[in-house]
């Protein structure tokens, strides 16, 4: 999958953008605040219907404008699509695929599998379990066709159950939801466990390349006692859940944990090592998608050079090139990209929201 053309209007500080991209590497060069991260954000938004920088729409739409518009032409093998997204200041989102209305953001997400590597992305390792659940669920969204429907229904039932608990309703009023909730919980957990098991060897292998001095181990935890029946857990813990006003145990508490030398990685690794581990996770997941589904991710890498020495930057560049994926990389100077010795590339300068091709 690759974006061949991108149009951006009224998005942050970017002047109207109309760019053609290389299917391999695209480098965005500019000072801090110039708009290069905003372009990555626009690409990410086109594939996710949300920002990785802000949840507040009014901060993303250009000042005094009613909406922003994103349009992309994408291609994969012999197939081509035209996709568009418009976000209104009052919150509505309009999605078009090949000129047709009525599409969902999930349709865009399926067309554009993306891996994001940013300085803030270390929350995957040192943040709460929700970040690691999202990592697993991203993979399942692209690998298991029934996952998104099951995941959506699971979250809907959990919200309904929690609302009933907060209203102090008796178990007789909640029991009807618990049967279906338990069924979905077991299915989602089974998928997560299978995906984690399939991905773990690739993660550990990639970690050996980036962090050979460490032994990295991964493990999946489903969010309730292993081998226990979740329906029985819901029954047994009803009074506790009602006192808490929410469902304490379940797939909403699942985690995908990483340890180095037997200890949590956030307690052992330096910030630079954590970034390398994050890169290893994203690369392994993208390569797993290619191996299993013959689909390439698009990699978005913000501030490529930060916290990586010259050797590790060269290693990351080589692995990205081997992946065959389309890659977007930001840097302050071309010098920071000297390890990116690639034949197929385009270079862009970014200054005060204006983006120009350099080659």
Swiss-Prot record:
Domain of life: Bacteria
Entry's localization field: Cytoplasm
Residues engaged in binding ATP: 30-37
Paired cysteines (S-S): none
Keyword terms, alphabetized: ATP-binding, Cytoplasm, DNA damage, DNA repair, DNA replication, DNA-binding, Nucleotide-binding, SOS response
Function in brief: The RecF protein is involved in DNA metabolism; it is required for DNA replication and normal SOS inducibility. RecF binds preferentially to single-stranded, linear DNA. It also seems to bind ATP.
Similarity comment: Belongs to the RecF family.
Protein name: DNA replication and repair protein RecF
Species: Haemophilus influenzae (strain ATCC 51907 / DSM 11121 / KW20 / Rd)
Gene: recF
């Amino acid at each position: 999958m690759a974006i061949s053309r991108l149009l951006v209007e009224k998005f942050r500080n970017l002047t109207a953008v109309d760019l053609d991209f290389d299917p391999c590497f695209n480098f965005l060069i500019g000072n801090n605040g110039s708009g290069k991260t905003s372009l990555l954000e626009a690409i990410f938004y086109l594939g996710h219907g949300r920002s990785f920088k802000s949840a507040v729409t009014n901060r993303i739409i250009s000042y005094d404008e009613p909406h922003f518009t994103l349009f992309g032409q994408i291609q994969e093998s012999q197939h081509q699509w035209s996709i568009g997204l418009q976000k209104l200041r009052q919150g509505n989102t309009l999605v078009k695929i090949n000129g047709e209305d009525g599409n969902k953001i999930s349709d865009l997400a399926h067309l554009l599998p993306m891996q994001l590597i940013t300085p803030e992305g270390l929350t995957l390792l040192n943040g709460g379990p929700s970040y690691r659940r999202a990592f697993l669920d991203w993979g399942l969204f692209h690998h298991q066709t029934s996952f998104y429907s099951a995941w959506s229904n699971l979250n809907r039932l959990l919200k309904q159950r929690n609302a009933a608990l907060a209203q102090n309703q008796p178990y007789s009023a909640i029991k009807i939801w618990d049967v279906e909730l338990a069924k979905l919980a077991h299915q989602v957990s089974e998928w997560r466990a299978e995906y984690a098991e399939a991905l773990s060897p690739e993660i550990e292998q990639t970690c050996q390349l980036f962090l050979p001095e460490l032994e990295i181990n991964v493990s999946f935890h489903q969010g309730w006692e292993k081998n226990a029946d979740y329906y029985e857990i819901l029954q047994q813990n009803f009074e506790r859940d009602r006192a808490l006003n929410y469902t304490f145990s379940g797939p909403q508490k699942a985690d995908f944990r990483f340890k180095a030398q037997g200890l949590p990685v956030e307690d052992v690794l330096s910030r630079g090592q954590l970034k390398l581990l994050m890169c290893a996770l994203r690369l392994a997941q993208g390569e797993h998608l290619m191996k299993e589904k013959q689909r390439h991710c698009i990699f978005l890498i913000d501030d490529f050079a930060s916290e990586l020495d010259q050797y590790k930057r060269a290693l990351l560049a080589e692995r990205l090139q081997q992946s065959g994926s389309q890659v977007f990389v930001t840097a302050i100077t071309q010098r920071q990209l000297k390890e990116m010795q690639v034949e197929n590339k385009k270079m862009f300068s970014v200054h005060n929201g204006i983006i120009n091709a350099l080659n």
